């Protein structure tokens, strides 16, 4: 098994960080880490798979897609160092779910308030588009993480339709009904756990107004309440 039967979050994070299972993703993440974007030319790049971040006993789990090439692939922390992350962490801060309004790097002092942020694909994919084979290969990592945190989770926010479908396939997850993904939709899962749909805070979604800060605030206000935080 790819996840190696990790017994704790730190052990799982260590295993994730050295995975080389997908040749295309390995080549891309490492090429980006060497070539770099001009704005970050003087900064070291993580250039490895990105583990989940946040509480090891989260009441709220946030599921994205994959690291950004010059965001999490650079900083080593989910949604950190790119515009999507700027929008996400600002909203989380307004909701009282993190202690800082922006996430700059892994040493910036950011702390989670009973939340965890993760993704079904751990390496930055070319064009932000992992192949089906890649996310299937990567899926044991999320499944292992889910086994370690699921007993604490009371609410899940899926950032985008892909994350929505992935959550519904997690071990032990079943919905009383499975509505199609849309922004603001809520699915009742097992034992009172709720799954909330949210448009991904991508640069395109934010710039076009498909997703606004107010819409993010509504989602995380509701998620916080459902999670009992």
UniProtKB/Swiss-Prot annotation:
| Record keyword Magnesium present | no
Concerning Gene3D superfamilies, the annotation shows: Uracil-DNA glycosylase-like domain
Q: Which gene encodes it?
A: udgB
Annotated residues that bind [4Fe-4S] cluster are located at 19, 22, 123, 138
The UniProt similarity line reads: Belongs to the uracil-DNA glycosylase (UDG) superfamily. Type 5 (UDGb) family.
Q: Which UniProt keywords apply?
A: 4Fe-4S, DNA damage, DNA repair, Hydrolase, Iron, Iron-sulfur, Metal-binding
Provide the protein name. Type-5 uracil-DNA glycosylase
Domain of life assignment: Bacteria
**One Pfam match, by short name?**
UDG
Task: Give the UniProt record's GO annotations in the biological process aspect.
Answer: base-excision repair
Q: What is its EC number?
A: 3.2.2.-
Report the PANTHER family cross-referenced here: TYPE-5 URACIL-DNA GLYCOSYLASE
Q: Which residues cross the membrane?
A: none
User: What does the UniProt function comment say about this protein?
Assistant: DNA glycosylase with broad substrate specificity.
Q: Which organism is it from?
A: Mycobacterium leprae (strain TN)
**InterPro entries, sorted:** UDG_Type-4/5 (IPR051536), UdgB-like (IPR044147), Uracil-DNA_glycosylase-like (IPR005122), Uracil-DNA_glycosylase-like_sf (IPR036895)
Query: Matching SUPFAM superfamilies, A to Z?
Result: Uracil-DNA glycosylase-like
Q: Which GO terms describe its molecular function?
A: 4 iron, 4 sulfur cluster binding; DNA-deoxyinosine glycosylase activity; metal ion binding; uracil DNA N-glycosylase activity
């Amino acid at each position: 098994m790819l996840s190696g039967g990790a017994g704790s979050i730190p052990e799982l994070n260590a295993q994730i960080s050295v995975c080389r299972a997908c040749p295309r993703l390995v080549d891309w993440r490492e090429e980006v880490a060497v070539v770099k974007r001009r704005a970050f030319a003087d900064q070291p790049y993580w250039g490895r798979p990105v583990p989940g971040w946040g509480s090891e006993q989260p009441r709220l789990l946030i599921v994205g897609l994959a690291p950004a090439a010059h965001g999490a692939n650079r900083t080593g922390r989910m949604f950190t160092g790119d515009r999507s992350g700027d929008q996400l962490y600002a909203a989380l801060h307004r909701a009282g779910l993190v202690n800082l309004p922006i996430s700059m790097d892994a040493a910036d002092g950011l702390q989670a308030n009973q939340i965890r942020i993760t993704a079904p694909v751990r390496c930055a994919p070319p064009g932000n588009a992992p192949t089906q084979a890649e996310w299937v290969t990567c899926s044991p990592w999320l499944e292992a993480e889910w086994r370690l945190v699921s007993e604490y989770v009371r609410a899940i926010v899926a950032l985008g339709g892909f994350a929505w479908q992935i959550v519904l396939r997690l071990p032990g997850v079943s919905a009383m009904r499975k509505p199609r993904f849309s922004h603001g939709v809520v699915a009742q899962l097992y034992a009172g756990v709720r799954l909330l749909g949210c448009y991904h805070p991508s640069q395109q979604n934010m710039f076009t107004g498909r997703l606004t800060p107010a819409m993010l605030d509504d989602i995380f206000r509701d998620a916080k309440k459902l999670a009992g935080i």
